[in-house]
From Swiss-Prot:
Motif (LXXLL): 313-317
Protein name in the entry: AT-rich interactive domain-containing protein 2
PROSITE patterns, per the entry: ARID, RFX_DBD, ZINC_FINGER_C2H2_1
Residue numbers bearing the Phosphoserine modification: 4, 631, 635, 689, 1300, 1391, 1496
In-chain residues carrying the UniProt-annotated modification N-acetylalanine: 2
Molecular function in Gene Ontology: DNA binding; zinc ion binding
Matches recorded under InterPro entries: ARID_dom, ARID_dom_sf, ARM-type_fold, Chromatin_Remodeling_Comp, DNA-bd_RFX, WH-like_DNA-bd_sf, WH_DNA-bd_sf, Znf_C2H2_type
Cross-link for Glycyl lysine isopeptide (Lys-Gly) (interchain with G-Cter in SUMO2), residue positions: 7, 15, 119, 555, 1701, 1716, 1731
Species per Swiss-Prot/TrEMBL record: Homo sapiens (Human)
Lineage: Eukaryota, Metazoa, Chordata, Craniata, Vertebrata
GO terms classed as biological process: cardiac muscle cell proliferation; chromatin remodeling; coronary artery morphogenesis; embryonic organ development; heart morphogenesis; homeostatic process; negative regulation of cell migration; negative regulation of cell population proliferation
Recorded superkingdom: Eukaryota
Gene3D superfamilies: ARID DNA-binding domain, Winged helix-like DNA-binding domain superfamily/Winged helix DNA-binding domain
Length: 1835
């Protein structure tokens, strides 16, 4: 097959041969086969080249038409003298290639008549030249009719092999063996032995191995052929097998065994050994057969046949014992493969005996390969259960010992093989497990392997290992499968058609279960219909159509692709009227193309359905369409069934701008639940009738279950009520919860559509909100099972446009399970309350999402003049106040409580009172969401409130917000409202007279709203007057949120901007306490400027004399700027001795300050008179600013401060509470419970969850780690050291301090109830956990404690250093345990800044006797680095002073550490100003970033009182931000702390680990503490220590630095002892010293210091009972608590370095301060007696949990476990589990390692669950045996 160019290259030749084969097959199928290729000039004609050439010129027809055959002839081998060469070439092409071209190139149908009836006029070459044997076949029917035999011998290819092997002809045998070798290779056509099992026997016979039965081939092959072929296989086996036991398997029938042994000796003497190799004919033949058997042993179907063939087993045993290396390797490999299917005969059979002999010999060998193969064979033998008895009996103890010895070798493959066989052996039962356990140190080695890392084997350990990962179908991404919705385009709504998903999927992934690919023909027809349409004037190239189809199929990785013939059939089906024409293409040398006429390409392809749903049963679509008066055709979003089971995909049904009298919203979200699928498609046409004035509402009650819903389908019902004067409450119970009915009457006029979308998946909201439709996104918070969520959307008057929502782009966010996250993109939302014509319609959309995941695309709130905007986050209800309507609107909100009693639903009543008439177009609205006190509630509900005021202006008397008490209906209600336990209808008239409405409501919890940013300078708000109406206890809440302009600050990145990121993790346990709010200011790193966060001021007034107070802007040119998050202005008056009486506010003015910039010289101006001016500095990178102060008390503080007091008579007690709980004074008991909220906090079981859920990094927010998720009754334990106490509960004191909410009974404030008739508690606001213990007012002395404000002093201290978040300053209180804001007082230490009068209820006598209420270390401590806090007590802002209150005498200075970046703003303290005045004293706190608080016990002498000035030294944070990421992988289950104490000198030897699970009683955990570490301390590093903080250990409070115009009167500091100079034995490189009392030893690393201190000073026998570290508070601690404290406070790198720096100056300062002890106020100079500190019950767990973030559990937690490490650990754990399950001896040995295994069982290792099962086996088996013994004794 040569052409004119000479010899073809190999590729061309290969292609030519393939073409000829295909051509022959084509002609054969048509009945016109050819055998010879035509020859031209003595050479074969290159048909492939001819076909290629002709087709490139356009095909046969085109070449003939242009008469180009003469040109083609020149390229082939026609003689030059041949005149008819062109004609001959054309005939050859016509005979061989024309039909092939027609079918394969042009894709036309083969219209040839089948060859059964050939036409005589065909050319001679078309007549079939082969004989038709089919004419002789007799049908089965005829055979049966005539009695012919029906039993046919169907010959197959295997019969040919068998016959070839049987023939004995060398030629045939070689051919058959070669074929078997090829077939045995892993390929598409694997040899199937079951088709003819005789092949195995014949192959073995050709290798000289025969069966012992009579029918064997030994006679033929062994004797007769040996003479003819000169091949003696018997001699071959005898030569290569030396083991006498195995030699008996050699079949030698000629000689008796008695005489052979002697002859063998002489043969070995006189004959040289066999030279094995290529020249050894027998050896090569045996090797060939061994290769075939080995290859076959990898196929499951062949393994059973090979294992059942005893001759094959004999051959393998002979091969395994031969000294022919290649043969031995092949034999052992094959034995290992078939051993799993090998059923051993009884041991008296020789093969069984030899099998164990082979295994033992391999195990005892010194050859690594033999050892591994022996273990593999033994392990696979264990897989057959019938072999268990034999294996347990005949595998001796020496073999077990040899196997276990392999574990000590640093060889990965050997260790893996050993673990595999040990695991298989332990599955056999108690005999094997006991034998393993009896091997010395076997259990110890296995326990060590559980925590082994692959790095222990060295860097070259993986060189010999090749990892082949098989991706499982469960891990395949489903994101690429996007079923497309086929929208129904409606002309009325003008919805443009847009495919919802991509037409081409980039990556092929298997569809999820239940999704089946549609068949090829249907897909091709859909594809044609989607891409082409009928057009009689157009044509499309048919080849291009097919090529595009092939391209689409390849991109989609479709399985079935139609051939061109099938494709053209589909083309005729889709376009039956098309025609075909030939079109000349001038660009390709005049080549003609076949075009399809009458078909045109679509401009926009239609969507294609690629999959269909097999299980459409579980889906339900609820569509409620209510069309009042005028009913246009609804436009449902058609969604194929396939979309309802695909998670994380959404259907985008665009909603265009409707006409003026039609508003429609379409949303469709495919939802994937846990077990069910809910699909909600809602479309609600708006009532276009302008003349109808209807009173209606559309309440929707959705009762959800937080647990997975196995059966029910989650449904969302959309109700559009068009019937006048009817309320339509709808209850949908999902998950079995009892539906709670909600009856609400709405008096606004106009229809109100409500769209409720309920889903359990991530909702992506695209830009689907029409411009005239405000979007109210209401996401229910943590909803326990059966808790109703009621959302009532108030209708708006028809004549007023409610607002617009513009430009809401899609925003995608990934949220972990159980967390809500609402992110917004920074597009403006403008909600205008302007008036429109009566014909305008409004529409609100309420989206109710379940507590799984929600991503709501809303936008930043940008306010201009007369703009009202609000957005509501999780669990919040929204009511718009100020919308004018003829009647007072009344809306009841049934909010969410965590599993309350069925009859006690938390209710939140928001009363709307429009004050101005609709004719006032400039009226502004205030959105207030509050929550009332709950009556008879078991614990504080998880209710969060949003208080959003109009940022631009607040007209006088605009907003009235009241929180009512259940079962109270106000007298001024315009219409009767049913009052139930669940709903509190409350109405307010526009008058300012107070109304009697029950007990005081709770202090409002504010949900920080995303900072509002403006691109332009907005005009300053006009003077605004807010009138607040007061209820019976005169408790009124008014929250104003001014809008600040952010001039010059660009929009931040939209990916980081968020409205509200809130996380309410589901807590475990039946009595889940109230959740906390996350109030993060979104962390957006601005490029070069600081952004202005959203200010918020909370004014809380308790007054029965004045009905309101004024908030007036001073000048229009200024704007009220109040801090980042939450600022509560609490001017607190001294409560009189009588009942509930407070002083009115005369004129409380908010001074609008100028816009705060980053410049350090920002000036804040104060006003004169009795005014309190708050100016909050929200900037991120503030230098210490210069503050010019006016006459007034001026507080310049970042967001989150509590300022108490202006003057007597102007003060506003936050909440005046009557004494409760049967107080002797007889006050009425108040059962209101305040939800124990801290504003800016997260409660979660794991910090990683919080980080992942909120999308924030570690430095972006506080995360409060919930330690004991299942607390009793409402006592919420947090790791922050705050006890949240509820009504009727005197909360136990956590770490010496209480969290007293403002509605707490005074019995919790540290005073005796008898002496406290009334306690004025000051709450610092929800975003801070400052001095929540508040001011404990004493009735007799009329004194109020100093309110010590410590915004960041209560944060968990990590490594003993308080350091701030490295962030943008948008958040104040960050509470992540290993945070830079962490200064933790929960480990048994009490915060020295604590007012000691509120420390403990047991302090009543002391507090009553000497009334010594002290503020430790001064009243002001600022930790934040970006603000200057200045408090000047003016004459009218007096600091209350009584005999026991001590204030700072001078400025409290914080020296700024230069090496720490500036951090977030902190808070400043304002003393109460009631009685006496300290003139001219200024307290300036210059916060430093990451600075160590002066009271931290981690440093030796932090606070030195020198001339009345307290200095705060700064310490660098031990772990920088870069280090924080490395701590994230610590094995941390929920609520578990794992502590590691490892010896740094020999790191790999042992580690001391302890873990305390969440929910465990600390006293119980302490009993399980392991003492082995102390016992083994002398020999090697301690193994495992369990650190538990004691539950109730009395601890003395911290010393207080008192500066009150007198010398400092503080008790001797524990760090006042002189610190000796460093150890003279210090060696080079030793930079860290143990600062333990009189130790002074030097070490190289902090870990060495920690190990030394934990073992030498914290040992069981030497621990003195308290920490004697220099500068540490002398608190009594249990030893396990001390170890945690030691690691947290003292043994970090920075803490040690700081201790060294402050060692010498610390001595002088502490001694100096300790010598100053004059009297204070005439009291004696003796130090105050230490008070006992009552630890919270969960203090131990929280202390353990808190430090877990700092541990570097590097052995197996830093990096993710590799596959080999995971395999080794998991296999070792499985072995231990089996040993613990079956072996009594093993259990006894495992008991010693129970503590170690307990730690590992709660880690994040892959083997942790297996280890937990192992521990269960240890305990359960013992208990079950004890029970069996007891039952036997009873019988």
């Amino acid at each position: 097959m040569a052409n004119s160019t000479g010899k073809a290259p190999p590729d061309e030749r290969r292609k030519g041969l393939a073409f000829l084969d295909e051509l022959r097959q084509f002609h054969h199928s048509r009945g016109s086969p050819f055998k010879k290729i035509p020859a031209v000039g003595g050479k074969e004609l290159d048909l492939h080249g001819l076909y290629t050439r002709v087709t490139t010129l356009g095909g046969f027809a085109k070449v003939s038409e242009k008469n180009q055959w003469g040109e083609i002839v020149e390229e082939f081998n026609f003689p030059r003298s041949c005149s008819n060469a062109a004609f001959a070439l054309k005939q050859y092409y016509l005979r061989y290639l024309e039909k092939y071209e027609k079918v394969h190139h042009f894709g036309e149908d083969d219209d040839e008549v089948p060859p059964g009836n050939p036409k005589p006029q065909l050319p001679i070459g078309a007549i079939p030249s082969s004989y038709n044997y089919q004419q002789h076949s007799v049908s089965d029917y005829l055979r049966q009719s005539y009695g012919l035999s029906m039993d046919f011998n169907s010959p197959n290819d295997y019969n040919k092999l068998v016959l070839s092997l049987l023939s004995g002809l060398p030629n045939e045998v070689d051919f058959a063996i070669n074929v078997c070798t090829l077939l045995s290779n892993e390929s598409k056509h694997v040899m199937q032995l079951e088709k003819d099992p005789k092949i195995i026997t014949l192959l073995l016979a050709n290798a000289g191995v025969f069966d012992d039965t009579l029918g064997s081939f030994s006679t033929v092959f062994g004797e007769e052929w040996k003479e003819k072929t000169d091949r003696d296989f018997v001699k071959f086996w005898k030569d290569i097998v030396d083991d006498n036991e195995v030699r008996d398997l050699i079949s030698d029938r000629n000689k008796s065994h008695e005489g052979t042994s002697g002859e063998w000796i002489w043969e070995s003497l006189f004959h040289p050994p066999r030279k094995l190799g290529i020249n050894d004919i027998e050896g090569q033949r045996v090797l060939q057969i061994a290769v075939i058997l080995r290859n076959l042993s990898f196929e499951e179907g062949n393994v059973k046949l090979l294992a059942a063939n005893r001759t094959c087993l004999r051959f393998l045993l002979l091969s395994a014992h031969s000294h022919f290396i290649s043969l031995r390797q092949l034999g052992l490999d094959t034995l290992g493969n078939i051993a799993a299917e090998l059923l051993l005969d009884p041991v008296d059979f020789k093969t069984t005996h030899l099998m164990f002999h082979t295994v033992t010999k391999c195990l005892m060998s010194r050859d690594r390969f033999l050892k591994m193969r022996g273990m593999e064979i033994l392990g696979n033998l264990c897989k057959a259960e019938d072999n268990g008895v034999l294996i347990c009996e005949y595998v001796d103890q020496d073999s077990y010992r040899e196997i276990i010895c392999h574990l000590t070798l640093p060889d990965v493959l050997l260790v893996i093989s050993t673990l595999e066989v040990l695991y298989m052996l332990t599955e056999m039962g108690d005999v094997a497990c006991t034998k393993i356990a009896k091997v010395e140190k076997s259990i110890d080695m296995l326990v060590c392997l559980v925590s082994m890392d692959i790095q222990m084997f060295g860097p070259d350990a993986l060189a010999a290992v090749k990892l082949i990962e098989h991706p499982s179908s469960s891990h395949q991404m489903l994101s690429e499968i996007r079923p497309q919705a086929i929208e129904q385009v409606q002309t009325q709504t003008h919805v443009a058609s847009a495919p919802a998903s991509r037409a081409v999927v980039a990556q092929h992934v298997a569809p999820p279960p239940g999704i089946v690919e549609i068949d090829s023909e249907k897909f091709a027809c859909q594809w044609l219909n989607a891409h082409f349409e009928v057009n009689p004037d157009c044509s499309v190239s048919r080849a291009e159509m097919y090529s595009e189809y092939l391209s689409t199929c390849s991109k989609l990785a479709r399985g079935g692709i139609l051939t061109s013939t099938g494709f053209y059939k589909c083309l005729r089906t889709v376009f039956p009227n098309h025609t075909v024409k030939r079109v000349e293409d001038s660009s390709s040398n005049g080549q003609a193309h076949i075009h399809v006429v009458g078909v045109k390409r679509r401009a926009i392809p239609l969507p294609i359905q690629m999959y269909y749903q097999q299980q459409p049963v579980s889906t339900s679509v609820v569509r409620v369409d209510s069309v009042p008066d005028v009913s246009p055709a609804p436009s449902p979003a058609g969604i194929p069934h396939g979309s309802q089971t695909i998670g994380n995909h959404f259907q985008r049904t665009p909603v265009a701008n409707q006409s003026s009298n039609l508003t429609a919203t379409q949303m469709s979200f495919p939802v994937q639940g846990v077990h069910t699928v809910a699909q909600t498609v809602s479309r609600i046409p708006q009532n276009p009738s302008p003349h109808t004035h209807q009173q209606q509402n559309a309440p929707v009650t959705v009762i959800q279950s937080k647990a997975p819903i196995p059966c029910e389908v989650v449904k969302a019902t959309v109700i559009q009520n068009s019937i006048p004067q009817t309320g339509v409450p709808v209850s949908i119970a999902v998950g079995g919860g009892p539906p709670q009915s909600s009856v609400v009457q709405n008096h606004s006029t106009g229809p109100q559509p409500v769209t409720v979308v309920n889903s359990q998946t991530l909702l992506h909201h695209p830009s689907v909100i029409p411009q005239q439709s405000p979007l109210h996104t209401v996401v229910p918070g943590q909803i326990p099972s059966g808790t109703p969520v009621t959302v009532i959307q108030q209708a708006v008057p028809q004549s007023h446009m409610f607002g617009r929502v513009q430009n809401i782009p899609a925003c995608t966010s990934t949220v972990s399970q159980g967390q809500q996250l609402i992110t917004t993109s920074p597009q403006p939302v403008q909600t205008s309350s302007q008036q429109t014509s009566a014909g305008s319609q409004s529409q609100d959309t309420v989206i109710i999402a379940p507590p799984q995941y929600v991503t709501t695309s809303a936008s930043n709130i940008v306010s201009a003049t007369s703009v009202q905007n609000f957005q509501v986050a999780t669990g919040q209800m929204v009511t718009i106040a100020g919308v004018p309507s003829p009647q007072a609107s009344r809306v009841g909100f049934q909010n969410i409580a965590p599993k309350p009693l069925p009859s006690q639903q938390v209710s939140s009543t928001v009363v709307q009172q429009p004050i101005q008439q609709p004719q006032q177009p400039t009226q502004q609205s205030v959105v207030i969401v509050s929550q009332p006190a709950q009556q008879g509630q078991t614990y504080a509900p998880a209710i969060h409130q949003i208080v959003l005021a109009n940022p631009a202006a607040l007209p006088a008397g605009q907003t009235v917000q009241l929180t009512g008490q259940p079962n109270i209906t106000p007298s001024s209600s315009p219409s009767p409202v049913p009052a139930t336990n669940n709903q509190v209808p409350t109405a307010m008239s526009s008058s300012s007279t107070p109304q009697s409405q029950g007990p005081p409501p709770t202090v409002s919890q504010m949900l920080s709203v995303k900072r509002q940013q403006q691109q332009q300078h907005s005009p300053a708000p006009p003077p605004q007057q807010v009138q607040v109406q007061v209820q019976q206890p005169q408790q009124v809440q008014m929250q104003v949120q001014p809008q600040q302009s952010n001039a010059g600050v660009g929009q931040p990145a939209s990916g980081e901007s968020s409205l509200i990121k809130q996380l309410l993790l589901p807590k475990r346990g039946p009595s889940t306490p109230g959740g906390k709010l996350i109030l993060p200011a979104p962390q957006i790193p601005p490029p070069n400027n600081a952004r202005a966060p959203s200010p918020q001021v909370v004014y809380q007034v308790a007054s029965n004399q004045a009905a309101g107070f004024g908030v007036q802007g001073q000048t229009p040119a200024q704007q009220l700027l109040v801090g980042q998050q939450n600022v509560q202005l609490v001017p607190s008056a001294m409560p009189p001795s009588g009942g509930v009486q407070t002083v009115p506010i005369s004129n409380l003015q908010i001074l609008p300050g100028p816009l705060i910039s980053n410049s350090p010289a920002t000036i804040f101006q104060g006003t004169s008179g009795n005014q309190v001016t708050i100016t909050v500095v929200p900037n991120t990178s503030f230098a210490p600013a210069t503050v010019s102060q006016g006459n007034a008390t001026q507080l310049i503080a970042p967001a989150g401060i509590t300022m108490s007091g202006t003057q007597t008579g102007v003060g506003l007690p936050v909440q005046t509470l009557p004494a409760t709980q049967a107080s002797p004074a007889g006050q009425s008991s108040c059962t209101t419970a305040t939800p124990p909220f801290k504003g800016d906090k997260i409660i979660c079981q794991k910090e990683e969850e919080a980080k992942e859920a909120t999308g924030l990094h570690v430095h972006e927010r506080k995360i409060e780690v919930m330690e004991n998720p299942s607390c009793r009754r409402g006592a919420t334990n947090t790791s922050n050291g705050d006890t949240k106490e509820n009504e009727m509960h005197v909360g136990s004191l956590l770490n010496g301090r209480k969290y007293s909410d403002s509605s707490l009974p005074p019995s919790n404030s540290g005073k005796i109830q008898s002496e406290t008739n009334q306690c004025s508690l000051i709450s610092n606001g929800p975003s801070l956990e400052l001095g929540e213990n508040g001011a404990s007012g004493k009735q007799n002395s009329e004194q109020i404690d100093m309110q010590d404000i410590k915004s960041d002093l209560r944060k968990p201290l990590v490594n003993g250093i308080c350091d701030f978040d490295k962030g943008d300053g948008s958040h104040l209180s960050k509470n992540i345990p290993n945070h830079k804001t962490s200064n933790h007082v929960g480990n048994g230490e009490i915060s020295p800044m604590e007012p000691q009068g509120t420390l403990d209820i047991t302090q009543q006598d002391t507090a009553k006797g000497d009334q010594l209420e002290r503020i430790s270390n001064g009243p002001v401590l600022t930790l934040g680095g970006s603000s200057v806090s200045s408090i000047q007590e003016a004459s009218n802002a007096a600091t209350q002073q009584f005999s026991g209150t001590d204030l700072l005498n001078g400025p409290l200075a914080s020296s700024l550490n230069s090496d720490v970046p500036q951090q977030r703003p902190s808070v400043v303290v304002s003393p109460h100003s009631t009685t006496s005045v300290i003139q001219g004293h200024q307290i300036i706190a210059v916060p430093d970033s990451g600075s160590k608080v002066s009271h931290s016990p981690a440093l030796s002498s932090d606070v030195r009182s020198t001339n009345g000035t307290a200095e705060c030294k700064t310490v660098k944070r031990p772990a920088e931000d870069t280090d924080r990421e490395t701590v994230a992988g610590i094995p941390n289950k929920v609520g578990v702390r794992i502590v590691t104490i490892s010896d740094p000198n020999n790191a790999g030897c042992s580690a001391t680990m302890v873990a305390v699970p969440a929910g465990a009683d600390p006293s119980t955990v302490a009993k399980v503490a392991i003492e082995s570490a102390v016992q083994q301390k002398q020999q090697h590093p301690p193994t495992y220590v369990q650190n538990v903080v004691p539950q109730n250990t009395p601890m003395p409070p911290s010393p207080a630095v008192q500066v009150q115009g007198q010398p400092n009167s503080s008790q001797p500091s524990p760090f006042s002892g002189s610190s000796q100079p460093g150890d003279p034995m210090r060696k080079p490189g030793q930079n860290f010293m143990c600062l333990w009392q009189s130790c002074k030893k030097w070490f190289q690393t902090p870990s060495q210091v920690f190990y030394h201190a934990a073992t030498e000073h914290g040992g069981k026998d030497v621990y003195p009972g308290q920490c004697l570290w220099e500068g540490c508070e002398p608190f009594q601690r249990q030893r396990f608590s001390f170890i945690t404290h030691l690691q947290d406070k003292h043994c970090s790198k920075d803490a040690l370095l700081a201790g060294l720096k402050q060692d010498e100056p610390g001595q002088a300062g502490s001694q100096k301060s300790s010598t100053k002890q004059p009297t204070v106020g005439g009291t004696s100079s003796t130090p105050r007696a230490q008070k006992a500190i009552v630890n919270h019950p969960s203090a131990a767990l929280m202390a353990l949990r808190r430090g877990s973030r700092n541990l570097v559990f590097r052995d197996f937690t830093d990096e993710k476990e590799g596959p080999i490490t995971k395999h080794i650990r998991l296999t070792a754990a499985l072995i231990l589990k089996n040993i613990g399950k079956y072996s009594e001896c093993g259990r006894r040995l495992l008991k010693r390692h129970e503590n170690n295994l307990s730690v590992l069982a709660i880690s994040n290792m892959e083997a942790s669950s297996t280890l937990a099962k192992c521990l269960y086996e240890l305990n359960f088996t013992v208990q079950s045996k004890e029970q069996e013994k007891d039952s036997e004794m009873l019988q």
